[in-house]
């Protein structure tokens, strides 16, 4: 096994750890889930570039008669990228004391101001940061509003 194979294994393990944390661990942290709302994806171009470059590496490894283990590892890396960028749906998860947005825990008391833009984007102003929450279904904004009013 070469150094390249070890680096690819490291990347696969890192992506797998992130996927397990996002799917199974994060919803169980900081209390029960009150509401989980699917969000719009930001951009699939980054994922397309990642999977495309990995496909080029797979092709190059096959045509240059590289080791089969490297081909399999690159294929696993491409599948992890496919899952993370296309299959997994980003969510905002509301808990009794706060919420997870982009895998970051934010307590309700940090919210200074909330606005709704014309195009249906919920804007939350924190102390030093502005969150732009783009929900997949516009009716979910009403659920978020009712939850925030009931918990505040």
From Swiss-Prot:
Q: Name one Pfam family in it.
A: DUF986
Q: Which UniProt keywords apply?
A: Cell inner membrane, Cell membrane, Membrane, Transmembrane, Transmembrane helix
* Transferase is among the record's keywords: no
GO cellular component terms, alphabetically, are: plasma membrane
Tell me how this protein sits in the membrane. Multi-pass membrane protein
The record's subcellular locations are: Cell inner membrane
Transmembrane stretches, start-end: 6-26, 45-65, 67-87
Q: Which HAMAP family match?
A: UPF0266 (MF_01071)
Give the similarity note. Answer: Belongs to the UPF0266 family.
Q: What is this protein called?
A: UPF0266 membrane protein KPK_1957
């Amino acid at each position: 096994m070469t150094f390249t194979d070890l680096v690819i294994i490291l990347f696969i393990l890192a992506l797998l750890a992130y996927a397990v944390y996002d799917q199974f661990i994060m919803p169980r942290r900081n209390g029960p889930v009150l509401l989980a709302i699917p969000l719009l994806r930001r951009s699939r171009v980054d994922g397309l570039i990642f999977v495309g470059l990995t496909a080029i590496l797979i092709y190059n490894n096959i045509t240059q008669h590289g080791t089969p283990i490297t081909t399999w590892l690159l294929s696993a890396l491409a599948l992890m990228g496919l899952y993370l960028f296309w299959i997994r749906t980003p969510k905002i998860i509301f808990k009794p004391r706060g919420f997870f947005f982009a895998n970051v825990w934010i307590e309700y008391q940090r919210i200074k101001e909330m606005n709704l833009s014309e195009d249906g984007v919920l804007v939350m102003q924190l102390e030093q940061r502005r969150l732009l929450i783009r929900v997949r279904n516009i009716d979910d904004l009403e659920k978020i509003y009712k939850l925030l009013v009931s918990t505040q």
